[in-house]
């Protein structure tokens, strides 16, 4: 339905429509390239006649600026390029299986709690 809605909004010249699509290169079962490579999303969306632009999802000012992009007569799709372990490098070793995090042991849970809280400069969660 997403593609149909996009196609219809282009067909009808709907330009008060904009959406943010998270592009984090992963699916539940692993990396997009391993599970189901979807190709160049920006090129596909633009080929429908919409305007797709890429921005750094971790840069709030870039996200705000993207919303102002001229897209008269067509919808705007903001492709927010994100890292699922941004600000939590301890999780990087689990990439691309980060859709959910299961701890292998109580020791790993405690280690992750401490490392992530240190990196984020917050107090660890007390269990």
Feature annotation, model-predicted:
Residues 1-72:
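Thiamine diphosphate
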Residues 60, 64-127:
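Glycine/aspartate-rich loop-and-adjacent alpha/beta segment that forms the canonical ThDP
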